[in-house]
A protein has these predicted regions:
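N-terminal auxiliary "cap/dimerization" subdomain that precedes the catalytic jelly-roll/cupin core
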Residues: 1-107, 111
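A generic structural signal for short, solvent-exposed coil/turn residues
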Residues: 19-20, 112-114, 126, 141, ...
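A structural signal for short, well-ordered beta-strand segments and their strand-loop junctions
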Residues: 27-30, 112-117, 148-152, 161-163
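Short, solvent-exposed loop/turn segments at secondary-structure junctions
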Residues: 32-35, 120-127, 139, 155-156
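Short alpha-helical interface elements
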Residues: 41-45, 64, 125-129, 159-161
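Hydrophobic alpha-helical segments and helix pairs
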Residues: 93-136
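Catalytic core of non-heme Fe(II) oxygenases with the double-stranded beta-helix
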Residues: 130-163
Length: 163
């Protein structure tokens, strides 16, 4: 007896999957705003500590204006200090995953592996040396079957973005 195949996805889920397949990326809101705030605050605290400045109350404004506190020659040292500090936080990886868990589950399934260390990229205004090419880990030998979650910690717009 033939059993009819039915689509188990809602129309919204199907549309999200089709967008991912056609565009190769998705822009979605985070699922855990408190987790995003905690990660952002952690990054701000680590950056201020490395720069030896008092952490302002408005951590979002601090990160949005970080270029006022660090120059291009000092950028990589600060970035590495923040990365090391982030990866020492036992809660951070699980919190990062919680930001997009259901979208990842829908798009790629639940049999996932997460890289061991969280990374960080920072671009300063008018700094062409820190701009990234189109991101494709397959060129460096990573699997073409991976999904990269990029989480902006600042307000991104036309000239204030990754590309």
């Amino acid at each position: 007896m033939d059993v009819p195949v039915t689509n188990m996805l809602t129309a919204a889920e199907e549309a999200l999957n089709q967008t991912f397949l056609s565009d190769g990326y998705l822009v979605v809101p985070v699922e855990n705003q408190a987790g995003l705030d905690r990660i952002r605050d952690c990054v701000a605290e680590l950056a201020a500590s490395h720069l030896k400045i008092d952490l302002p109350n408005d951590r979002q404004a601090f990160l949005d204006g970080l270029h006022q506190h660090v120059d291009v020659p000092g950028l990589n040292d600060m970035r590495l200090a923040v990365i090391n500090g982030m990866n020492q936080q036992p809660w951070l990886r699980a919190t990062y995953f919680s930001l997009v868990r259901s979208v990842l589950d829908q798009v790629v399934g639940n049999e996932l592996v997460m890289q061991r260390r969280i990374n960080l990229s920072i671009q300063l205004p008018e700094d062409s040396s820190s701009l990234l090419p189109v991101h494709a880990d397959t060129w460096s030998g990573d699997s073409p079957f991976e999904v990269v979650v990029w989480l902006p910690l600042v307000d991104c717009f036309n000239s204030k973005s990754m590309y």
